[in-house]
C-alpha cells in the first residue's frame, strides 16, 4: 500500500492531523497524544525553544527510498518507501530541533507487531544517523527480545 502522506509538503504533520482526526485509521491513546503534542508544539513550541523543521524531516524520509530496497517478499528489489506510521516516527525524530539546532529527541522507542517493517526502519535510521547527519562518532543501538532478534538489524 502506498504511503499517502509522502505527497504532502509536510508529511509528518499531515500524518499527525489524520491521527488526531481519527478519520483515516485508528490510533491508540499514546499515539494520539504524541500527534496532538506535535501539532501543539508547531503552534507554540518556539516559546519553549523547540522548532519544527519540515525540510529536515523530509530529508530523512527521502533517504529511505533513495538508499534502501525491500529485500524480501513480492516487493523485493523495489525502493523502501516508509510505511505511513514510519512517516510520523522518522519525521518527529529528525524534524524537531532545539534552539542550538540539536535534535529535540535523542532517543526513540518503537514497539509494534510483527510485519510492520521495524527492522528495516531501524536499520535505515541507524545508517542515516551514522552517515548523513554530520554527527561525528554517532552511535546507534538496537535492542530486541533476545540476541537473535536484535541481530536482525
Where does each model-flagged region fall?
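Phosphate/NTP-binding elements of NTP-utilizing enzymes
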Residues: 2-153
